[in-house]
Amino acid sequence: MRRFFYRHSRGVTEVVVGSGLQYGDYVERPVVLAEEGLRPPIPGAPTLALRGGEEVKSLEVLTKVYGFLKEVGADRSTTLVAVGGGALLDLATFAAGTYMRGIRLVHIPTTLLAMVDAALGGKGAVDWGPVKNLIGVFYQPAAILCDLSWLGTLPERVYRSAFAEVVKYGLALDGDFYSWVRENAKALLARDGGALEYAVYRSLQLKAGVVEVDEFEERGVRQVLNVGHTVGHAVERVLGLLHGEAVAVGMVAELRLSSELGYLRESHVAEAAEVLSSLGLPTSVKATEQQLAEAAALVKFDKKRRGGHIYIPLVVRPGRWILEKIAVEEVEKAVRYVLRQGG
């Protein structure tokens, strides 16, 4: 088992990574939100089962959660325990941050992607109509409990897709960790407990370091977490890839863009593509001409756009990055780097 703490505006969050964690050691007066089908994590605790996926982040479901909390007598001494994937953790964060102006929150992510991404950061949101994450809060959990035993039944494709975020942390923030991931790809795919524990632990350490410096996205430092996501989001929406698969494709496109701008050696682009492939991730995708056009057009609506430019975090060498102002047209070209015409 590994653990660390990070500081933020609300105090300190404890992060624990291991197998067979005893959740009762970390919560008092627990009330649980859990995805349907998961085993009850805390026997005897009031539990509301919810469907997973983006649909859970609605005002209708949020109202249901508020009603549940009121019904079971939740107050400022209650701990809301969120058990599930990233979407449910987002909803729970918003609910905990707004119910009675804030109650204690503990995250128990049950997918690898949620462990290395959504569980840490303090972002909570619900969608409004077709607009994702329109209504949100920053609200840090008191504890994040990454119990690797949840991953045993995770489908292979879903499991592999999370490694795009792990590679991202190494590429952008820690060259030594990037090398470690490259050397341990086989162990990670084999779900080796020791390798997986370190990968999750180090990924969260690196993300926590960013959050400590730029908790509320006011200093630009948190932009590094968007490496691969500018192109990735466009590809994800048009082609229906899993989030991690789209981020992998987006990383290759943005690394190539960095190389064309003279920041990154071409050999680093090729190496990163090999690392992603070794983890079972795509580095390019077949697309029709219409899909190519749709994905290229979508980057124009990126939230980081300012006028005719988009501010994109670019890797300049493993472990180092810069925030660069890129013409929208250049980003559209980057989309075409990784979408092969066909189909």
Swiss-Prot record:
Gene3D superfamilies the UniProt entry points to: 3.40.50.1970, Dehydroquinate synthase-like - alpha domain
| Biological process per Gene Ontology, one example term | amino acid biosynthetic process
Pathway connected to this protein: Metabolic intermediate biosynthesis; chorismate biosynthesis; chorismate from D-erythrose 4-phosphate and phosphoenolpyruvate: step 2/7
Report the subcellular localization. Answer: Cytoplasm
List the GO molecular function terms: 3-dehydroquinate synthase activity; metal ion binding; nucleotide binding
What are the EC numbers? 4.2.3.4
Task: List, alphabetically, the GO terms of the cellular component aspect.
Answer: cytoplasm
Q: Cofactor: bound how, per the entry note? A: Binds 1 divalent metal cation per subunit. Can use either Co(2+) or Zn(2+).
* Record's keyword annotation contains Metal-binding: yes
Q: What class of enzyme is it?
A: lyase
Q: What is the annotated role of this protein in its UniProt record? A: Catalyzes the conversion of 3-deoxy-D-arabino-heptulosonate 7-phosphate (DAHP) to dehydroquinate (DHQ).
Q: Which family does it belong to?
A: Belongs to the sugar phosphate cyclases superfamily. Dehydroquinate synthase family.
Question: Mind telling me what this protein is named?
Answer: 3-dehydroquinate synthase
This chain's source organism reads Pyrobaculum neutrophilum (strain DSM 2338 / JCM 9278 / NBRC 100436 / V24Sta)
